[in-house]
Design a protein with these regions (language model features):
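A helix-coil-helix interface module used to build multimeric assemblies
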Residues: 1-203, 208-214, 221, 277-278, ...
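Glycine-rich cofactor/substrate-binding loops
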Residues: 2-38, 99-100, 267, 282-446
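Charged/polar positions within long, soluble alpha-helices
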Residues: 44, 48, 69-76, 94, ...
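A general structural motif at alpha-helix termini
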Residues: 60-61, 217, 273-275, 362, ...
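Alpha-helix capping and helix-loop boundary segments enriched in small/acidic/polar residues
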Residues: 105, 110-113, 157-164, 168, ...
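Short amphipathic alpha-helical segments with heptad-repeat character
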Residues: 119, 123-130, 134, 141, ...
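Acidic, glycine-rich loop-and-beta core segments that form the ion-binding/anion-interacting portion
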Residues: 217-305
Length: 446
């Protein structure tokens, strides 16, 4: 049975071990390849300050690359009796290479090791989310342009209000996601800082070259103060969680609209048959289950910042085991959100719109504001025009003119989709994902 990295001459109670480890072994599989990547940078730095020989470094790097390949391919496992991913990697190195495998932990604590793993994992997953957000923005804008001239009712208080268009509806969600991307970029900025070298939260007596590991791992900068680096555990996850929650909020709202507009009482859009499910008793049913599940899962993601806040609430400075619990809600959230983004993009691309909604007379009254504005533009005082049209509606004599002419920025006739696209693309470019990829690939090269 492998010993714990911290074990001395007292064996821990089995029940205590099960309780304290919890689901950490399973969750650590999310972090496996990032743990290896961090170790590669760390030992490269250790060799530069004389704590490893060049031959030892070459041997360790070769074995770590093999472990990385297993982790990347999903073949990495944490053996029974091994506490976490850090212990498994060190065990494999020691088993295969002997005593040199025991040297990789010099100048490092599991505290800064897991901090590093989480940051490397998070920035990689942020990239996945950002790419899927951009794909959904693209589909929404394509539909907005395709149906830019198709009018639909706009609502306030769920009451028919004023003319809108599918160009506006699709485009509104594209712009909302473009704004959400700005928050995700801010979260990425705090994520892409190197905590390695903070050790247990108070640094090391070894002359660690933190600038070197920052450069090797493609970080923008480092968490400079070693105490703050440890204070960032939980804080950074919460910052990222707020960004994920913003995206989830937009997608959940869109899913609600789609379910509503797809219902027979609205009939504004039609979802593809292959994206709906049936009923075991009602043969006519085509249920929007995908959008309903997207809504539910995105609503759950919106609770993530509060869950993290409550776990870390009122903790003083330093590391506490409470923080382990954050991994259980935080790590799976990225895949949950990207799954929702993929499904939403797929269905939006195939969604059909009803181009004849306004043939129904029940929507005639929404053109009342257009008539009031026309009368006011002709010289009638606005309040008099408002009263005149209101009386016509009450008397049932109002005859709408359904030809509208909106030209100002962001209106039915001037969607500004090109500006929103440029804004989203500029935000995406600022992430600088390419520089991170280049650094990681260089580190992995033999």
């Amino acid at each position: 049975m492998p010993t714990k990295l911290w074990e001395k001459n007292v064996q821990v109670n089995d029940a205590i071990e099960r309780f304290t480890v919890g689901h950490d072994r399973e969750l650590d599989l999310y972090l496996a390849k990032y743990d290896v990547l961090g170790s590669m940078a760390h030992i490269t730095m250790l060799e530069s300050i004389g704590l490893l020989t060049a031959d030892e470094l070459r041997t360790l790097l070769a074995e770590l690359r093999a472990i990385y390949a297993d982790a990347d391919a999903g073949r990495f496992v944490i053996e029974d009796g091994v506490e976490d991913v850090h212990s498994e990697v060190e065990l494999l190195l020691t088993r295969r290479l002997g005593d040199v495998g025991k040297k990789i932990h010099s100048g490092r604590s599991r505290n800064d090791q897991v901090l590093l793993d989480l940051k490397l994992f998070t920035r990689d997953k942020i990239r996945d989310v950002a790419e899927h957000v951009m794909a959904l923005i693209g589909e929404l804008q394509a539909q907005s342009e395709r149906h830019r001239n198709v009018l639909m009712p706009g609502y306030t208080h769920l009451q028919v209000a004023m003319p809108s268009s599918f160009g506006l509806w699709f485009g509104a969600y594209a712009e909302s996601l473009a704004d959400d991307l700005v928050l995700l970029e801010a979260a990425y900025r705090t994520t892409n800082r190197n905590p390695l070298g903070s050790a247990a939260g108070y640094g090391s007596s070894f002359p660690l070259d933190r600038e070197m590991t920052t450069r090797l791992l493609g970080f923008d900068s480092m968490d400079y103060n070693v105490v703050y680096a440890q204070m960032g555990r939980g804080k950074n996850e919460r910052t990222v969680a707020f960004a994920l929650a913003g995206i989830a909020g937009t997608v959940a709202k869109m899913a609600f609209d789609a379910c509503l507009f797809n219902s027979q009482n609205f009939g504004f859009v039609k979802l593809p048959d292959e994206c709906t499910t049936g009923s075991s008793i009602m043969p006519h049913k085509k249920n929007p289950d995908v959008f309903e599940l997207i809504r539910a899962r995105c609503n759950r993601i919106q609770s993530l910042p509060e869950q993290i806040t409550l776990i870390m609430n009122n903790l003083p400075v330093g590391y506490f085991r409470d923080l382990q619990e954050i991994k259980e809600v935080f790590l799976p959230a990225f895949d949950a959100l990207t799954d929702c983004l993929v499904m939403a993009t797929y269905i939006i691309h195939r969604m059909k719109v009803n181009e004849h909604i306004l043939d129904d007379a029940r929507y005639d009254a929404m053109f009342s504001v257009e008539e009031v504005n026309r009368l006011a533009a002709g010289g009638m005082p606005f309040r008099d025009a408002y009263k005149k049209v209101g009386l016509e509606i009450e008397a049932g004599t109002f005859v709408p003119d359904k030809h509208i002419h909106h030209t100002h920025a962001g209106s039915i006739g001037n969607l500004c989709n090109d500006r929103v696209k440029a804004m989203a693309e500029a935000t995406f470019a600022r992430f600088g994902f390419g520089r991170v990829t280049e650094a990681e690939q260089k580190l992995l090269q033999p």
